Amino acid sequence: MRTAPTILHLDMDAFFASVEQASKPSLRGKAVVVGGLGPRGVVATCSYEARVFGVHSAMPMGQARRLAPHAAYLVPRFELYRSISEQVMRLLRELSPLVEPLSLDEAFVDLDAGGAARDAETARLAGTKLRTDIRTVTGLTGSVGLAASKMLAKIASEAAKPDGLVLIPPGTERAMLEPMTVRTLPGVGPATGDHLRRAGITTVGEIAEAGEDELVRLLGKAHGHALYAMALARDERPVVAERETKSVSVEDTYDVDIHDRVRVGVEVGRLADRCVRRLRASGLSGRTIVLKVRRYDFSTLTRSETLRGPTDDPAVVREAAARLLDSVDTTGGVRLLGVGVSGLADYTQEDLFAQAAGDRAEEPAEEPGTEPAEAHSPSPAERRWPSGHDVRHTELGHGWVQGSGLGRVTVRFETPYSGVGRVRTFLVDDPELTPADPLPLVADTEGGAGQPSSGPLPLPASLPKSWSGGGGAAATSRP
């Protein structure tokens, strides 16, 4: 393990919810929940204000509504989240060529590899500057952990939340880890934690005291060896730049089981088109098409077909997905469908036979009711108004959907740069109201530095956790 705290872990604070608060002045400082809003929806993330009421990620949306009935419930805007994530990742790549993204809002950075830090002092300066740059470019906050290993850097960033920085000086790792619960260590979930608790082991220090042989006896060879090493603060894993994408996929869960076989086919076609758009956006193609079907009884079936060469042609992917669907019995009802592409490559091999078959497969898609929804501009009566999504009115300007139903849609007219806006209600087919693209969170920027027009978002009134390290082993800083 290295001798300087030059591995940085960044975790954006309540990322999806923070984006929504930054773009909607009326939601700043309020409880915000982002996720699927149907009866089977789950929470993707929530603001710290919502966490005070017990709401958390992966919770069923119905339970979240019971805990926080007055929160704002919004449909995710993934394209906006990806765009902001790329702004953050560009800032990380300015620090080092070794950036390991873990998700849209989380990444490791090897500061030593880029010359950005060589010791604790320069690492702290780099982490502080990064947090300032993220706030300037995106208007959002992120928490930074600095340590000599990936495991410790991630533990430090958790302790820094929200909007803080924690540095673990080399030589203090064991003292910092010992009083922490076993669940602090990566790979220790509820089952392993309960198993250790029944053996009288509840802290990381007690894991180290138990010894490697006892841990192997309790947990098996691989897990026992790994857990013992982590308890001793040993972690030699390097930061791996831009881990290779293995597959691209999309899926939808339906509020009501689909029984109509024709509609199932239409949904599979739409998913295939969405998957190809994501594939092309990444500059990739693939040769293995995968269909996922979750039936009414929660049984999940996966079917795949490998083509003769990579493709990014929507007709080819649609036809392959349709063939796979032919082998699946859906008569009892379908609650989830997914289409994916694996065997990825950065080039496309033309397959004339598949292309010709795909052209034929496209013809039925032009019939009413079977064309993918995104392939044409819907009339006003056909439009959906997802809660939280952007709209524009010809007279009132930019706003977002607060809710819709009973033939009405309610819109709040405000932007990231305005004050709290006024609310108006329209008929869902009002010709002056149209869907709109999201506005940048920071005004007057072009992918670079700028200033949040209405100031930084305030810290939540109630912080979710506090640093539990002992003896001053870690240094914590907040604005």
UniProtKB/Swiss-Prot annotation:
The record marks 16 as: Substrate discrimination. The active site is at residue 106. Keywords: Cytoplasm, DNA damage, DNA repair, DNA replication, DNA-binding, DNA-directed DNA polymerase, Magnesium, Metal-binding, Mutator protein, Nucleotidyltransferase, Transferase. Its cofactor is Mg(2+). Residues 381-396 have a biased composition (Basic and acidic residues). InterPro entries: DNA/RNA_pol_sf (IPR043502), DNA_pol_Y-fam_lit_finger_sf (IPR036775), DNA_pol_Y-fam_little_finger (IPR017961), DNA_polymerase-Y (IPR050116), DNApol_IV (IPR022880), IMS_HHH_1 (IPR053848), Rev_trsase/Diguanyl_cyclase (IPR043128), UmuC (IPR001126). It catalyses: DNA(n) + a 2'-deoxyribonucleoside 5'-triphosphate = DNA(n+1) + diphosphate. Belongs to the DNA polymerase type-Y family. This is DNA polymerase IV. It comes from Streptomyces coelicolor (strain ATCC BAA-471 / A3(2) / M145). The gene is dinB.
